UniProtKB/Swiss-Prot annotation:
GO terms for biological process: DNA transposition. It holds the Pfam family Transposase_mut. Belongs to the transposase mutator family. Required for the transposition of the insertion element. Keywords: DNA recombination, DNA-binding, Transposable element, Transposition. It comes from Burkholderia multivorans (strain ATCC 17616 / 249). This is Transposase for insertion sequence element IS406. NCBIfam families: transpos_IS256. One of its GO terms (molecular function) is DNA binding. InterPro entries: Transposase_mutator.
């Protein structure tokens, strides 16, 4: 008789990571969740496999596969079954907030009749070939998730010296039309040196009234001590910033400024030269040297690129505010590039649905993603040292 070798789940998960590095994280997660689900079933039954005991409530009845969309891609878990009781492992029921928000967006599209091939394909992988969903089921699940996300969006804020503001657009169904809605995002660096996602909002545009309402909501939650705002040059945001935080200086994003300069330079070779000149200005050791280099560049541009010179005379000084802050902080404060990770992840996550069924669905997914990112930042390393 052959000897049966028991595989330790922790060893199997470790082996997956050892063999494939972070690429094996999905397999490690699958192994550990499967084991956690089996342990939870044993606790529910009041008995381990094959154990005879008077405390047993029911009997194990095999497993059913379930495919879940996670940040590691599609993972198929083995869901433990029981004979006659209502049991489901909590690890698989909950999932991550972002995964739930993505799946709810698809489910909302389905029950509202937006049954595109892509939506059907994904839901069939999640729920099986026979999709059985009702509006009531989807509404209950959405309400449960929204409660926690609303609490996160409305949590108290505090001392936040540096405030980053940005927006991106998502396609949303609104009053029978498909419109581009602005997703307003605020990220801050707290006095502790940690980055935090401060809030988000879905609006019909980046008009002043929307940015103003968003900024006022941050102040109402306790945001204070802001010494610098880092943002791109947008008329609505600029007007709202002046109205709500008039005394706080503004650092214009240097990265987007360089992109704008490139559009005002016709020849490719000249574009490279202008980019190098702008980098020299931005990388200057202090404001005095930066202003000297800018003055020299403007003299050249007036002759060779008059349109660029006219624009740069007012635009570039708006990107030099950072020189009034500690040298050790400047590299973190020059651009809004730190928000690009958020935008990349949002693009990846929204690709499945492509069009949100309503603004609430869009806000739910954005909030879930940002809440998870905020958790990472809160427990991670200090981003900026205020006490060198």
């Amino acid at each position: 008789m052959a000897m049966r070798v028991e595989t330790n789940p922790l060893e199997a998960a470790y082996a997956a990571l050892l063999e494939n590095g972070l690429d094996g994280a999905g397999e490690a997660l699958r192994i550990l969740v499967n084991e956690a689900a089996k342990i939870e079933r044993s606790a529910f039954l009041g008995a381990r496999p094959y154990e005879r005991t008077e405390t047993r409530r029911d009997y194990a009845n095999g497993f059913k596969p379930k495919t879940v969309l996670t940040r590691h891609g599609e993972l198929t878990f083995q869901v433990p079954q029981v004979r006659s009781s209502d049991f489901y492992p909590s690890a698989l029921e909950k999932g991550t907030r972002t995964d739930q928000a993505v799946n709810l967006a698809l489910a909302e599209m389905y029950v509202q009749g937006v049954s595109t091939r892509r939506v059907i394909d994904v839901l069939q992988r999640l729920l099986g070939p026979e999709i059985s969903l009702s509006s009531a089921q989807v509404s209950r699940a959405a309400a449960k998730l929204d409660e926690g996300l609303r609490a996160w969006r409305e949590r108290p804020l505090g001392e936040t010296p540096y405030l980053f503001l940005d927006a991106r657009y998502e396609k949303v169904r609104l009053e029978g039309r498909i419109v581009d809605c602005a997703v307003l995002i605020a990220v801050g660096i707290e006095a502790s040196g940690k980055r935090r996602v401060l809030g988000c909002e879905v609006a019909t545009s980046e008009a002043e009234i929307n940015w103003r309402r968003f900024l006022e909501s941050l102040l109402a939650r306790g945001l204070k001590g802001v010494t610098l705002i880092i943002a791109d040059d947008h008329a609505g945001l600029k007007a709202a910033r002046r109205a709500v935080l008039p005394s706080v200086p503004w650092q214009r994003c240097q990265f987007h400024l360089q992109q704008n300069a490139g559009a005002l330079t016709t020849r490719q070779e000249a574009r490279k030269t202008v980019a190098a000149q702008m980098r020299a200005i931005f990388n200057a050791p202090d404001r005095t040297e930066a202003e000297r280099l800018l003055k020299a560049a403007l003299t050249l541009w007036c002759k060779e690129h008059p349109k660029l010179a006219e624009w740069a005379e007012t635009a570039i000084p708006e990107s030099l505010t950072v020189f009034d802050f500690p040298a050790a902080h400047r590299i973190r404060l020059r651009t809004t590039n730190g928000l690009e990770r958020i935008n990349r992840e949002l693009r990846r996550r929204t690709r499945v649905a492509s069009i949100f069924p309503n603004p609430d669905s869009c806000l739910r997914l954005v909030s879930a993603l940002l809440a998870e990112l905020d958790d990472e930042w809160m427990t991670g390393k200090v981003y900026l040292n205020f006490n060198p």
